[in-house]
């Protein structure tokens, strides 16, 4: 199981977390152990130290590890799944075999407040009461684009499941993927990010 810890730095991916998860995914793949990823990730840790340390390069290692893994891969989005960090945490777009989400999921480029500030900045600035307009735009953005079934409608998740059914859904999914076979490309080895 690969999971974010929302009680530590809100669950963001930093250099160390990306490295640790990449090694773990590669280890599971090497020994043919299926991978279940539990997502609650608001993004990569911002900051000059992270940028100078190579957060993009280290995040790419995690992306590479997931993309090369041939074992069964199941993802479950618990709450937040924002931006590039969501993509590298075994999203449907990089080849997760099955992706589920709880009704509390939020899949987006960023949170509703930040997105509304960027998308509707002109309307907010032109409003008589900018704070009221911002609150209204955030509410509309959440209602239209961040409801739990929006991701399923767009094919980002296979199903929205009841949290009480999670254990059985994962058991059934692992049983279904037990005989997964992946055709490998005809190459000696990959070229991972350094």
Outline where the language-model segments fall.
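Ligand-binding clefts of soluble mixed alpha/beta catalytic domains
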Residues: 2-194
